[in-house]
A protein has these predicted regions:
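A glycine/threonine-rich phosphate-anchoring loop and its flanking beta-alpha core
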Residues: 37-136
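General structural feature for long, well-ordered alpha-helical segments within catalytic domains
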Residues: 1-5, 13, 28, 118-121, ...
Length: 182
């Protein structure tokens, strides 16, 4: 999908890429942005570290599920559909220039998807919390994020149209993966 996006971006002389969806869609937009700006190198070569990207088209994100935090992170995960191998690439070139984060765009999600998003936010937060480095401030922020996600997740799963809980989850998801907590 990302390779097709690169072809379309090159064909249309795109100067910007927008990912509207969740983490996978936004990560795909990031890959397209890197691929189009570094053509003719195949994007997978960046994710396998065979090559280093030096440029990227600007990326914007429109978030429709609170989960991965890709809307504010410098990382992107891709899966090579031919091999099934999944890899991540962290570079400031990946960080979106802007993110539209309107909780109303998440209110049609089924409760199961809301719960999956809550779990994803918690995992990103715990990844950073349980690292060997001690930092009282970032640990306290991570603990606050976990408390918030647990409390608001319970509300959101029962009532995905609760603006406040969906807003809190959206904010927590972004903070869990933007580098603030390690």
């Amino acid at each position: 999908h990302a390779r097709e996006g690169v072809k379309l971006a090159l064909k249309s002389n795109a100067d910007f890429v927008i990912g509207a969806g969740g983490g996978s869609v936004i990560d795909t937009a990031k890959a397209i942005a890197i691929g189009a700006a570094n053509a003719p190198t195949d994007i997978w070569e960046f994710w396998t570290r065979e090559k280093t990207p030096h440029h990227a088209l600007p990326v914007g994100a429109v978030l429709t599920i609170s989960a991965a935090g890709s809307e504010s992170s410098d990382s992107a995960v891709l899966t090579n559909l031919a091999t099934g191998v999944k890899r991540g690439l962290g570079t400031e070139l990946n960080r979106p220039r802007f993110a539209i984060m309107n909780p109303e765009l998440t209110m049609t999600l089924p409760p199961y998807q809301v719960a999956c998003g809550v779990t994803d936010i918690m995992m990103h937060t715990m990844d950073r919390y349980f690292n060997p480095l001690e930092n009282e401030l970032t640990d306290a922020i991570a603990e606050a994020l976990l408390r918030t996600v647990i409390a608001q997740g319970r509300i959101a799963v029962k009532n995905p149209e609760d603006y406040d809980s969906m807003s809190e989850l959206m904010w927590a998801g972004s903070l869990s993966h933007n580098g603030l907590t390690g």
